[in-house]
Amino acid sequence: MKRALFAAAFVAIAAVVIASASPTGEPAWFDMQGCAFCKNLVKDPELLKNMTWEHFDISNGALSITTVKPEFKKSYMEAQAAMMDIGKKLQSGELKAADVPMCGHCQAYGKLAQMGAKTEYIQGAAADIWLMTSDKPEVVKEIKAFAQRNRDELAKMEQAEKAGQAH
């Protein structure tokens, strides 16, 4: 399994090397320092090293599975709760998206939600599962592109870690 980031409710991500903005000006895909959602994942500096996050295409969208070592479950749940709280405040209008700093991943997640993608989050004892689905082919295509980008960015992070460039 790939080392990972998070399966957030809006969560749906890590490395400092990838956290800087790209030369094109688009935000980094994962930004553990600047993203209002993702920064919750590094409050416990050992959390990311002790969890996995995998993404899979399914017929009508994508599936993500997150596992966390038992001794880090509390930190993970605290991060999840903080991210969910931000998501709820955005949905209710208490916060405006323009006022909430977000990485590329979290921006894309929000865009998919605005396109009508349906999300389900299942919290289990052994793993958490996140589903993002749609009945609209154009939205399914975007969901799968999102999952592929996550796989690609996680692979880059894994390569950077192996090369000793991350963290």
For the regions a language model picked out, list residue spans one by one.
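Bacterial Sec-dependent signal peptides at the C-terminal "C-region" and cleavage site
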Residues: 16-25
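Bacterial N-terminal signal peptides
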Residues: 8-16
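N-terminal domain-start interaction segment
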Residues: 36-65
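A low-complexity, Ser/Thr/Gly/Pro-enriched, surface-exposed linker/loop concept
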Residues: 24-46, 72-114, 150-164
